[in-house]
Amino acid sequence: MKLTVSMITMNEEKAVAKVIQDIRRVAPDAEVLLVDSSKDRTAEIAQELGARVIKQFPPQGYGPAMDRAVREASGDVVITLDCDDTYPVEVIPEMVRLVEQEGFDLVNTTRTWRRPQAMPFANFLANRLFALGARVLHGLKTTDVHSGMRAYRKTMIDKVQWVAKGPALPVDMYVVPHRMGFRIKEIPIDYRERIGETTLHRWSSTVWTFKRLWNARKVK
């Protein structure tokens, strides 16, 4: 199976080279795809390292960027990854194996199977609360609905429609396939300190998350 590692970026010039080099180390033949809305040298650095870059400027937000990043991937398996060095690329081969050999359509990594030292306690509690909402409303046994690292079977992506707006798209990208009956696996990872500054607006993300968890009940 061909592999694409898709990332959305905004001013990640401090981390992008390391992240791409780490990806090449564990998946040398993978397509690395960035949907980029940066004002710094993120896109230039990525292209120098052989990545395919789609410019999205002015920025349209997390949801539309991530939707484009997975839908324009050329691989049979699409790995999503935050470009800030917080996720362990070493698990990519295992994620691909779970899709290719074990038949899963989506592999979610969970940062919050225990409290990570790199995550503020308030964020940890919020993520566990979101996960509880997914369990109660959708019967989804998870500890992390907002993980930035997942593996998707591309044929599944092509069959699923989600609301591609707002910062809570990861919720739809997890809950909707579950409600449609696709095979899902969750594996624990160790979450690390990020390189650079976060662009996440926590209050907006919280509101969107609960809104999407509630509205996704309509999916069958």
Where are the regions that the model predicts?
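Short aromatic/hydrophobic "clamp" motif used to bind/position activated sugar donors
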Residues: 78
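Donor nucleotide-sugar binding loop of glycosyltransferases
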Residues: 12-15, 38, 88
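Acceptor/aglycone-binding surface of glycosyltransferases and processive sugar-polymer synthases
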Residues: 57-72, 89-167, 193-214, 218
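The conserved acidic donor/metal-binding loop of glycosyltransferases
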Residues: 82-87
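Catalytic donor-sugar/metal-binding loop of nucleotide-sugar-dependent glycosyltransferases
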Residues: 141, 165, 175-192
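Short, well-formed alpha-helical segments that are part of the catalytic scaffolds
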Residues: 11-25
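A conserved acidic beta->alpha catalytic loop
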Residues: 36-43
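Cell-envelope/extracellular polymer assembly enzymes that use nucleotide-activated donors
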Residues: 2-4, 31
